[in-house]
């Protein structure tokens, strides 16, 4: 077992994306505080990073059998190394990461931050990974709850309360997650069929899946508009994210008919979802700085 093995086990890309979201939530909340507590920010980043990393390790352990079947995941470290020694060491690694993560979060002296992190962890591992992913077409909805936790954790580390801003972040990020995940399940549908994982598009069809995606994008857009209407973000934020969301809607509804190819359309929707969530995080971070300067 090399350092590279342990690094790959935490799914660094997923960890990085979630930490960027946590930082954007933290910075958004600072526009009410008018200053940034860099020590608390550091504790939040370290703690959240380690807990998310432990979640990814445990997910790798739980999914190692289906990961070995799917083309998209067959090269993950535990899919290639499924003997008991690798699994045992990975479990110990996850426990260490998780313990250190909550110790750092304890240094924030914010019980709400710790509670939200615990909820995100338990939902992702206990409900999504261990149960619903293999059993239900609605697993994506459950996964979106844990996926939306990082920005709320960052926000509440500053605000110490689940106010309207926190709930709007929850709505925006969770409803972004659904069309993002559905895009993957559409253009990787053969993988999911091969691993016998039920997905919404396989069971209900592409037409209904696309309608769900459009509705989620609309709710995502309305949540971002509400952030500006209620004074959490600027009109510059509103203009940029609204234009991007409208293009996402256009691609979801009209370009589906133009492309006449489910896989090409789903890949385009997936790429757009990455561009939009990255832009959202950048805009939330920069907007909060410009507001109090």
Swiss-Prot record:
Q: How does it sit in the membrane?
A: Multi-pass membrane protein
Q: Where in the cell is it found?
A: Cell inner membrane
Reaction equations catalysed: heme b + (2E,6E)-farnesyl diphosphate + H2O = Fe(II)-heme o + diphosphate
Name the pathway it acts in. Answer: Porphyrin-containing compound metabolism; heme O biosynthesis; heme O from protoheme: step 1/1
Among InterPro entries, the record links this protein to: Protohaem_IX_farnesylTrfase, UbiA_prenyltransferase, UbiA_prenylTrfase_CS, UbiA_sf
Q: Name one GO cellular component term.
A: plasma membrane
Q: Which UniProt keywords apply?
A: Cell inner membrane, Cell membrane, Heme biosynthesis, Membrane, Transferase, Transmembrane, Transmembrane helix
Q: What does this protein do?
A: Converts heme B (protoheme IX) to heme O by substitution of the vinyl group on carbon 2 of heme B porphyrin ring with a hydroxyethyl farnesyl side group.
EC?
2.5.1.141
Note from the entry: Carbon 2 of the heme B porphyrin ring is defined according to the Fischer nomenclature.
Q: What is this protein called?
A: Protoheme IX farnesyltransferase
Whose protein is this, by species?
Answer: Blochmanniella floridana
Q: Which processes are annotated in GO (biological process)?
A: heme O biosynthetic process
Which CDD domains does the annotation name? Answer: PT_UbiA_Cox10
Where's it mainly located? Answer: membrane
Hey, which family's this protein in?
Answer: Belongs to the UbiA prenyltransferase family. Protoheme IX farnesyltransferase subfamily.
GO molecular function terms noted in the UniProt entry: protoheme IX farnesyltransferase activity
Record bears the keyword Transferase: yes
Q: What class of enzyme is it?
A: transferase
Top-level lineage group: Bacteria
Q: Where are the transmembrane segments?
A: 9-29, 38-58, 86-106, 111-131, 137-157, 167-187, 211-231, 234-254, 271-291
